[in-house]
Every structure is written in C-alpha cells, then in structure tokens.
C-alpha cells in the first residue's frame, strides 16, 4: 500500500457575540485585536449592529476589503511563511493559537475589557467563542482635603510663596491601569480657573493602579499675593487616556475650599476725625480695620504697631514701640474692628506715622496690612515755626508809635494738602506772658485761613496795634494752627527770638554793640 501525506494546512474560523451585562443589549462597533501567537500576525475586527462577528467567508468574504477592520470587512491570516493567498473557499485562520483582546472605544467606555485565547485545530470548523459580556468597571471615587501645607489651615495669608496641599484619596480603580489625577484652582465667585501671570494654577500626578486605595498629596505652589478677599476651590479630575474616570468639582465642598482673608485699615485722630493730630501729651488714634473672608466662629487676634514713616522702623515713645491688640470671634466672614492707640506725641511735631496691622489665628498670620505709603493708614503731626517782622523796618524791631504793623510768617510742615486750615495768632507781652489787649480790653489776635497746596509751606498773619505803651518792651507772637476748629500745631515759645518784635525806648534798626540786641539804653 502507498500512502500520500497531504501538506495542506488546516484552516478554520471563529465567531462571537458581544452584549452588555448590565442591560443585556448587544454591543455594536466593538473592536478586537486578534493575534496569532505563533507568527505574531495581528488584525482588527469589529462587531456589527447586532453585536455579532464571524470570520467565515459565508458571512463576510475574506476577499472583501481584506483586514480593513470594519464590521463588514473580510479577515485573512496568512501562513507562517506569508505565502498563503486570500482564498474564500477555506477558513480565515490557519492552524494555531490566538489571542483575542477587546479594545477601548466609546461604546465600551467604563466596561471591563475582554481578553482571552482560542485555538484552531480542525479544518473547516468554526470555533464558537460564544457570548462575551461586558461587565461595568468599578467607578473610581475621589475625596479631597485641601489646606495650607505649612499650617494645615484652610485659611491662608496671601503671599508670594503659597503652598496648598490637596490630599486626594482615590478608590475603586482598575488594577494595572495608568491614571492621571489633575487638580485646578478655581475662583469660587467666577467659577473660572485662578490665573497667575496668565496661567491657571494646576498640579498633576500619574500612577499605575494596583487596585487598592491610593492617597496622593497634590501641591499647588504659586503667588497668591493678589488673592486677598478671594475664595478658591481645588477641583480634581481623574483620567486614563482621554477618558474622564472621576471628578471632584463641587464648588460648595468645604473640604476643597481655601479662604484668603484681606484687611484694610483707616487711621484717624479722635479729635480731628482725620489723619492729623497734635503733638501733645495725650493723643488717641483709632484704627478702623475692615476684614473680609474670615472663617466664622473662629477667634482671631488683631495686632497693631505704629511705624515711623521716615525711617520705616517702629515709632518709639519713651524708648518703647506703640502697640495695641485685641481678640475677637468672627460672627461673620466680613466686618470691622477698632483698635485705639493712646500715647504721648510730645516732641513728634513734623513726623508722620503709619499703623501696621496683623491678623492671626492661633499665632498663625492670616492677613496683614503693612503699606508704608498708604495714606489711609497714616497720621501726620504738623509743625509750625514763625518769624515776626515789622512792616516798616523789615526786621523784628518796631518803633513805639500809635500804629505798629507786624507780619508773622508761619512756616508749616506736614499738613495734608488740599484741606483748609486756620492760623490764629496772639500778641503776648514778653514781660508778663499775658496777651496784649486793645482799648476795649480785647485780646490782640489775628487769623488767616488757607488751603494747603502742599504739605510744607507758609502763610502770613497780620497784626496792627498801638505800640506807644510798649516802649522798652517786647511782643511775642504765638501761633496756633487749626483744622476744622481742632488744634493741630502750636508755636508758643516766649523765648523764641524769631517770634519776638522789640519796641525799644529809642528806635534803632541795628543791634546795640554792648547788649547784642535790638534794645538800646537811653542816655
């Protein structure tokens, strides 16, 4: 007997049906990758509108748009040496082992993708893989807790080096899958991303899931200096590929919310109700502090210190800084508080000081207002110097005549420009220290009103009086400067030569060589 061994390769086919486990609906346009394990040859197939696929030529001819990857395209695997041509009379798959891997698409999004194997062993036999069901993936869950990385508070002082940490807990992810968590800071008022230097403030991390709970620290490092009074919400998004697996974007979620407080201050004198005070033994300055965006129910400490505007250092009175503080519990997110500073301003004429305020929560600074150039925080202590001259002699010597005219030039410093002031001068007998009076017994006074064009300047006050009775005596001109009828500067030095006009027994416009004064002895 003679036996003939055929070298014809066995070829077969396979078929499958795809359905959704949750609703038992057939799933169309689901792609699979079919790979021959022996040769590595690989092609894409796709289910039709009934969720069905068959490689049989009777269903879709192998020669029809061969390996096009569509639901109605033919499938053909060649031989190991690549010599097998497409033949609609035989099976699409040569003898061997194959893998079948479901590929992600919109129609199976959120489903657990199938991955399996099958074998072709018999010629002209179709392997029925059966019904492949898509079980839904577990839906990832995100929970977050945002706070300041340094203090762990959700209330943060605006600064150039803010570091917000969002502790993100992620559960129910698919083991082996690469995920990316991306966080964005959102302005709660506008619902838009917080922008710094034209860019949104974001943070992201990528991880490969092991199927267990994942906890990640998301750091947002940025300049929050401009966010005083703002509330921001940290929004997180979990993705794999271009698919959004989970989000935590609730703008009302307090755990995701960060508060940036803001304070503004206005300092005024208790007498003038303005930014002007008198150099006196007792000045009372009230600093009205307006705050916004505090956490209600928390207890805060408001601390103030007076700063010398000229030096930028703390203002010292009797060698000590001038400070004040108060504690309060915020009943509302926004409100006002008043700090009162009572201190001795004697010797501070001509100076300006600025009130600096700091707001703390349990010793952690959450807001400050420290602008040395902020006029609203500034108090000015005016100063005045006077120079009296006789209108006739042009020096501070007058003739003992019936009508003496004197001009007292008041040089002022440190006024607030644009405001109206009044200078009130009084002529005082240097010998008695009492004001001069006219024939009717009225004190000899003169006033001048002016609006200060600048902080420093001068104004003339005119005096006219009977000098006949003052021969051999001197008159000193005291000047007071008022703002809204409140005294803000005084120059009243009985021994100040510049304020003094002499009325000698014998009038001379030169100094006596023996007395070195404008007074000369008769005889």
Q: Language model features by range: what are they?
A:
Residues 1-523:
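Solvent-exposed loop/turn and edge beta-strand elements of beta-rich ligand-binding domains
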